[in-house]
Amino acid sequence: MATRHQVRQSIVSLLYAAQLNQENKDFINEFLDEKKIRNDQRKFTLDLYNGINEQLALLDEKINECLKEHKLDGVASIEKAILRLGAYEILFTSTQKAIIINEAIELAKEMAGDNAPKFINGVLDKINKEVQ
C-alpha cells in the first residue's frame, strides 16, 4: 500500500502531466495502477487531484498573491504542481498545516531544483498565515 507521501508524489506527477497536456482518464488510472495506489489511498489521491483541478483558479490566485518577484506563470512546472497541492491542502483539508508544509518541502527536495524547498516553504507559509 502506498504511503501518503507516495500519494502526494503521484499527485504532483499527475498535475505536472496535466500541465503538459498529457492528462486523460486512462493515463491517470494506469499511472495509479503502476504506482500501486489502491483502495483508500486511491480515493484520497483522486479526491485531492480532482479538488485541485476544481479549485485551480482560486489556488493560482492565492499563490500569485504570495509571490514577490514573479507570478505563477514564471514558476517551474513541478514547483507549480507542489504549490498547488500544498495550497489546496491548506485551504480545503483538515490535515495539520505543519504536516502539509513539511510534505511540500520534502517533495520539493526530491522533485525540484535546489532553491525550491525554501521558495515553496515561503509561499505556503504565507498562505497558511492568511487563513489562520
Curated annotation (Swiss-Prot):
Cysteines joined through disulfide linkages: none
Keyword NADP: no
Entry keyword set: RNA-binding, Transcription, Transcription antitermination, Transcription regulation
One cellular component (GO) term of this entry: cytosol
Listed InterPro entries: NusB-like_sf (IPR035926), NusB_fam (IPR011605), NusB_RsmB_TIM44 (IPR006027)
A biological process term (GO) from this entry: transcription antitermination
Keyword Phosphoprotein: no
Name of one Pfam family that matches: NusB
Gene3D superfamilies cross-referenced by the UniProt entry: NusB-like (1.10.940.10)
MF annotations from Gene Ontology: RNA binding
Function comment: Involved in transcription antitermination. Required for transcription of ribosomal RNA (rRNA) genes. Binds specifically to the boxA antiterminator sequence of the ribosomal RNA (rrn) operons.
NCBIfam families: nusB
Family from the record: Belongs to the NusB family.
Protein name: Transcription antitermination protein NusB
Species for this entry: Campylobacter lari (strain RM2100 / D67 / ATCC BAA-1060)
Gene responsible for this protein: nusB
